[in-house]
Swiss-Prot record:
CDD domains: TR_SDR_c
Active site feature: Y167
Name under which the protein is recorded: Tropinone reductase homolog
An example Gene Ontology molecular-function term: oxidoreductase activity
SUPFAM superfamilies given in the database record: NAD(P)-binding Rossmann-fold domains
UniProt xrefs under Pfam families: adh_short_C2
Keywords: NADP, Oxidoreductase
Documented EC number(s): 1.1.1.-
Superkingdom in the source lineage: Eukaryota
Binding site for substrate: S154
Annotated InterPro entries: NAD(P)-bd_dom_sf, Sc_DH/Rdtase_CS, SDR_fam, TR
Residues involved in NADP(+) binding: 21-45
């Protein structure tokens, strides 16, 4: 099953021979991204804060014939990010084709209830870590001669959503960095894009729906999207993978919403 190609074996639709780093790759959208990239032939390096999650996923991928490896890493830690990139450098001989900044977190609160610690956690994980990983990965991406960065942003970085002011700010910052790096690093043959999902059926959403009040809020938000349903992780990972394929070679600096039409709905 590993190494799928479409388009009659056209190399524009293959990631065979390419290397990728996906942060937070053992759950939800990150897990789907690792599988999709590996299925198109990429050799993937990923990380997780949980050794148990990592071991379980690596075994599943091994059984599927995917080339996936990686360590435990908390990307909010500067020293752990540096160690991660040293491992990537060693594993991929100093070259990296794909960087997926997927790891992220949120704390839902009213704006007046956020603390300095909340701010540090959300911005540190969602923005600082992603930005710094781009800096650390730049020499490897440039050395590959054909590289792509994709940020996992959010519809919350495009329009206002409840209880998410700091999270939205972190994703809005990601969206602007996407545009800035796309322009600054084009000369190095590095493309930079972002995907901006809305509500996706992940373990986090499933857990939240176990609380009646949260389930009601989530269902209300889902109902505002024209497609009237939550998305699936595979519906995000497919776009992420497309943006990394050679066939997307003229696409850079874009923030693409994967939201069932939520951000463009004028009939709310």
């Amino acid at each position: 099953m590993a190494g799928r190609e479409i388009g009659g074996g056209d190399r524009r639709w293959s990631l065979r021979g390419m290397t990728a780093l996906v942060t937070g790759g053992t759950r939800g959208i990150g897990y789907a991204i690792v599988e999709e990239l590996a299925n198109f032939g990429a050799e993937v390096y990923t990380c997780s804060r949980s050794q148990n999650d990592l071991d379980e996923c690596l075994e599943k991928w091994r059984r599927k014939g995917f080339k996936v490896s990686g360590p435990v890493c908390d990307v909010s830690s500067i020293s752990q990010r540096q160690t991660l990139m040293e491992s990537v450098t060693s594993s991929f001989n100093g070259k990296l084709n794909i960087l997926i900044n997927n790891a992220g977190t949120t704390i839902p609160k009213e704006a007046t209830n956020f603390t300095a610690e909340d701010y540090s956690i959300i911005m540190g994980t969602n923005f600082e870590a992603s930005y710094n990983l781009c800096q650390l990965a730049h020499p490897l991406l440039k050395a590959s001669g054909n590289a792509s960065i994709v940020f996992n942003s959010s519809a919350a970085g495009v329009i206002a959503v409840p209880l998410s002011s700091i999270y939205a700010a972190s994703k809005g910052a990601i969206n602007q960095v996407t545009k800035s790096l796309a322009c600054e690093w084009a000369k190095d043959s590095i493309r930079v894009n972002a995907v901006a999902p809305w509500i996706i059926n992940t373990p986090i959403i499933e857990a939240a729906c176990q609380v009646p009040s949260q389930k009601k809020n989530i269902e209300s938000l889902i109902g505002r999207a024209p497609m009237k349903r939550a998305g699936e992780p595979s519906e995000v990972s497919s776009l992420v993978t497309y943006l990394c394929l050679p066939t997307a070679s003229y696409i850079t600096g874009q923030i693409i919403c994967v939201d069932g039409g939520y951000t463009v709905n004028g009939f709310i």
